[in-house]
């Protein structure tokens, strides 16, 4: 029987950190080996189970990245761009798999992270769910099939605590639409309309971000032409879909060669 994979969780006090702990607890394939939080956090040094309001579980919350990863096969990371860069460097030092769900990164930050893939396995995705990654592929195919008479808009909705916009998933969808049309997203992206903007530019890919309440995540890709519209839609009602996807990515990466991968690789959806 395969030994359960030892997983470290970063940002363990946050929404996704807690969901990952709960999801690990329901799986026989993985086990929680380390719980990490930022230096100075109230949970540092406390038993994770007690910090979560339950019983002791024998895992102390730590801010010592190297020690935590030395006893882990993989680290799952839904934190901030700056923290993710540090985790990528630490994971590469010890050869741990790094599964990244952090969003809001610049191209320079992504390059810093991907540079660590020379000696480590990195799986990075703006969204870990099966449904969203299928939506990405569908978006690319529909965009390729339709001409510029169809305007493309990506509309995303999230809870009122989300700090980046557009969401990482929205950008994935925008990239897919641009790739389908054979253009660069940077050249056609329209992320802000206010005041007298003038008519919509033909070929642009627009983004709309909604923030409110406790919305987990909703994404629509609208293809609108004269007399007809097509909408591709995904709704996440529970963060467990992201946690399950992240664990699937870690298990998939267990015996992979060093390199930078994404969820399309994990799910076998990559073209070619």
Swiss-Prot record:
<dbReference type="InterPro" id="IPR022664">
    <property type="entry name" value="DapB_N_CS"/>
</dbReference>
<comment type="pathway">
    <text>Amino-acid biosynthesis; L-lysine biosynthesis via DAP pathway; (S)-tetrahydrodipicolinate from L-aspartate: step 4/4.</text>
</comment>
<feature type="binding site">
    <location>
        <position position="37"/>
    </location>
    <ligand>
        <name>NAD(+)</name>
    </ligand>
</feature>
<feature type="binding site">
    <location>
        <begin position="11"/>
        <end position="16"/>
    </location>
    <ligand>
        <name>NAD(+)</name>
    </ligand>
</feature>
<dbReference type="InterPro" id="IPR022663">
    <property type="entry name" value="DapB_C"/>
</dbReference>
<protein>
    <recommendedName>
        <fullName>4-hydroxy-tetrahydrodipicolinate reductase</fullName>
        <ecNumber>1.17.1.8</ecNumber>
    </recommendedName>
</protein>
<dbReference type="Pfam" id="PF01113">
    <property type="entry name" value="DapB_N"/>
</dbReference>
<dbReference type="InterPro" id="IPR023940">
    <property type="entry name" value="DHDPR_bac"/>
</dbReference>
<feature type="binding site">
    <location>
        <begin position="125"/>
        <end position="128"/>
    </location>
    <ligand>
        <name>NAD(+)</name>
    </ligand>
</feature>
<feature type="binding site">
    <location>
        <begin position="101"/>
        <end position="103"/>
    </location>
    <ligand>
        <name>NAD(+)</name>
    </ligand>
</feature>
<dbReference type="GO" id="GO:0016726">
    <property type="term" value="F:oxidoreductase activity, acting on CH or CH2 groups, NAD or NADP as acceptor"/>
</dbReference>
<dbReference type="GO" id="GO:0005829">
    <property type="term" value="C:cytosol"/>
</dbReference>
<dbReference type="GO" id="GO:0019877">
    <property type="term" value="P:diaminopimelate biosynthetic process"/>
</dbReference>
<dbReference type="GO" id="GO:0050661">
    <property type="term" value="F:NADP binding"/>
</dbReference>
<comment type="function">
    <text>Catalyzes the conversion of 4-hydroxy-tetrahydrodipicolinate (HTPA) to tetrahydrodipicolinate.</text>
</comment>
<keyword id="KW-0963">Cytoplasm</keyword>
<feature type="active site" description="Proton donor/acceptor">
    <location>
        <position position="158"/>
    </location>
</feature>
<keyword id="KW-0521">NADP</keyword>
<dbReference type="InterPro" id="IPR036291">
    <property type="entry name" value="NAD(P)-bd_dom_sf"/>
</dbReference>
<dbReference type="GO" id="GO:0008839">
    <property type="term" value="F:4-hydroxy-tetrahydrodipicolinate reductase"/>
</dbReference>
<keyword id="KW-0520">NAD</keyword>
<dbReference type="GO" id="GO:0009089">
    <property type="term" value="P:lysine biosynthetic process via diaminopimelate"/>
</dbReference>
<keyword id="KW-0560">Oxidoreductase</keyword>
<keyword id="KW-0457">Lysine biosynthesis</keyword>
<feature type="binding site">
    <location>
        <position position="38"/>
    </location>
    <ligand>
        <name>NADP(+)</name>
    </ligand>
</feature>
<dbReference type="InterPro" id="IPR000846">
    <property type="entry name" value="DapB_N"/>
</dbReference>
<dbReference type="GO" id="GO:0051287">
    <property type="term" value="F:NAD binding"/>
</dbReference>
<dbReference type="Pfam" id="PF05173">
    <property type="entry name" value="DapB_C"/>
</dbReference>
<feature type="active site" description="Proton donor">
    <location>
        <position position="162"/>
    </location>
</feature>
<feature type="binding site">
    <location>
        <begin position="168"/>
        <end position="169"/>
    </location>
    <ligand>
        <name>(S)-2,3,4,5-tetrahydrodipicolinate</name>
    </ligand>
</feature>
<keyword id="KW-0028">Amino-acid biosynthesis</keyword>
<keyword id="KW-0220">Diaminopimelate biosynthesis</keyword>
<comment type="similarity">
    <text>Belongs to the DapB family.</text>
</comment>
<feature type="binding site">
    <location>
        <position position="159"/>
    </location>
    <ligand>
        <name>(S)-2,3,4,5-tetrahydrodipicolinate</name>
    </ligand>
</feature>
């Amino acid at each position: 029987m395969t030994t359960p994979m030892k997983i470290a969780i970063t940002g363990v006090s946050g929404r996704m950190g807690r969901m990952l702990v709960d999801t690990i607890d329901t799986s026989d394939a993985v086990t929680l080996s380390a719980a990490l939080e930022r230096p100075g956090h109230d949970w540092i040094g406390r038993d994770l189970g007690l910090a979560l309001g339950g019983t002791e579980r024998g895992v102390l919350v730590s801010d010592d990245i190297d020690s935590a990863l030395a006893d882990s096969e993989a680290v799952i990371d839904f934190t901030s761009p700056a923290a993710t860069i540090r985790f990528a460097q630490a994971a590469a030092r010890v050869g741990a798999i790094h599964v990244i769900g952090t969003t809001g990164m610049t191209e320079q930050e992504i390059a810093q992270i991907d540079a660590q893939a020379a000696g480590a396995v990195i799986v990075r995705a703006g969204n870990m769910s099966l449904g969203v990654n299928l939506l990405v592929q569908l978006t690319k195919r529909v965009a390729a099939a339709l001409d510029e008479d169809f305007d493309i808009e990506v509309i995303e909705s999230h809870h009122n605590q989300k700090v980046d916009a557009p969401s990482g998933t929205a950008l994935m969808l925008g990239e897919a639409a641009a790739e389908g049309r054979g253009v660069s997203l940077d050249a056609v992206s329209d992320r802000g309309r206010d005041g007298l903007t003038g008519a919509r530019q033909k070929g642009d890919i627009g983004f709309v971000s909604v923030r409110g309440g406790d919305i987990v995540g909703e994404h629509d890709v609208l293809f609108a032409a004269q007399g007809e519209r097509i909408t591709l839609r995904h709704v996440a009602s529970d963060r467990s879909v992201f946690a399950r996807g992240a664990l699937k990515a870690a298990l998939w990466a267990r015996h992979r060669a060093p390199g930078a991968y994404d969820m399309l690789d994990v799910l076998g959806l990559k073209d070619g």
